[in-house]
Design a protein with these regions (language model features):
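Short glycine-/polar-rich loops that comprise or flank the Walker A/P-loop
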Residues: 10-12, 89-94, 133-136
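Conserved catalytic network of the ASCE P-loop NTPase/AAA+ motor domain
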Residues: 66-69, 87-90, 131-133
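Conserved phosphate-donor/acceptor-positioning beta-strand/loop module used by diverse small-molecule
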Residues: 73-79, 88-112, 127, 140
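NTP-dependent small-molecule kinase module
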Residues: 107, 114-115, 129-164
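A conserved segment at the C-terminal end of the G1
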Residues: 1-9
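Short, well-structured alpha-helical segments
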Residues: 117-128
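ATP-dependent small-molecule kinase phosphotransfer cores
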Residues: 13, 17-74, 78
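Conserved nucleotide-binding/hydrolysis micro-motifs of P-loop NTPases
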Residues: 19-23, 81-82, 100-106, 145-146
Length: 164
């Protein structure tokens, strides 16, 4: 998803996740890493945040800490299961929960073609887990047109940045 040019010059940083999955530019712009290298780097503390999901390992690079120290607004895509850890490490972080109706999510996962039906069912069951207690996310319903979801996302980011 392309962001308006105002975000590139407005102090926003969109973090590229590190994932133990080959790069597929059509699905997600991420950095790929083999599982063993990932494990070694994780054990050495070379990630800002890491977690497991969907039989893969994910991480945010240490550059997150540098960007935050420079006063930038950092935007990262993480699992809701790592939100508590993120809030512990970054107490001022805001949580945006982007969701969609379950039928819409199922259709999108099937169309993406990365997972078999059993994996999709398990993923949908896992995604219904709530955010941790004490976290009040800004909820964005992405069930409709992409333009509507993007507009809601942009508005939420601008609101959060204005509060910093």
């Amino acid at each position: 998803m392309a962001m308006p040019s105002s975000f590139s010059r407005g102090g926003f940083v969109f973090v590229r996740r590190i994932v133990t999955r080959p790069v597929d530019a059509e699905l997600e712009d991420h950095d790929s890493m083999d599982p063993e290298t990932f494990r070694q780097m994780d054990e050495a503390g070379r990630f800002a945040l890491s977690w497991d999901a969907h039989n893969l390992r994910y991480a945010l690079p240490l550059s997150v800490d540098t960007d935050l120290a420079l006063g930038k607004t950092v935007v990262a895509n993480v699992s809701r299961h790592v939100v508590a850890e993120a809030r512990d490490k970054y107490p001022s972080c805001a949580v945006l929960l982007i969701t969609a109706e379950i039928s819409c999510r199922a259709e999108r996962l099937v169309r993406r073609g990365r997972e078999n039906p059993d994996q999709i069912t398990a993923r949908l069951a896992r995604e219904s887990a709530p955010v941790p207690p004490g976290v009040t996310p800004i909820i964005i319903d992405n069930s409709g047109l992409l333009a509507i979801g993007v507009t809601a996302f942009v508005m939420a980011l601008r609101t959060i940045a204005a509060q910093e």
